């Protein structure tokens, strides 16, 4: 039986658009994520 293809196909533009700072800030839930990461002291807030 053949295995499926690898599901992670890296693409920086897609990564930024899905998980980037501006995308996060555009929704209330996204802002909550950034706030939680700031509170925790994460070096990286978003992708």
UniProtKB/Swiss-Prot annotation:
GO terms, biological process: translation
Species in which this protein is naturally found: Corynebacterium aurimucosum (strain ATCC 700975 / DSM 44827 / CIP 107346 / CN-1)
GO cellular component: ribonucleoprotein complex; ribosome
InterPro entries from the UniProt entry: Ribosomal_bL34, Ribosomal_bL34_CS
Name assigned to this protein: Large ribosomal subunit protein bL34
Gene Ontology molecular function: structural constituent of ribosome
Pfam families: Ribosomal_L34
Region Disordered: start-end pairs: 1-28
Biased composition (Basic residues): 1-22
Similarity comment text for this entry: Belongs to the bacterial ribosomal protein bL34 family.
Keywords attached to this entry: Ribonucleoprotein, Ribosomal protein
Ribosomal protein recorded as keyword: yes
């Amino acid at each position: 039986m053949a295995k499926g293809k690898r599901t992670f196909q890296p693409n920086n533009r897609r990564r930024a658009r899905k998980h980037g700072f501006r995308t996060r800030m555009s929704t209330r839930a996204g802002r909550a994520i950034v706030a939680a990461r700031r509170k925790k002291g994460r070096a990286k807030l978003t992708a």
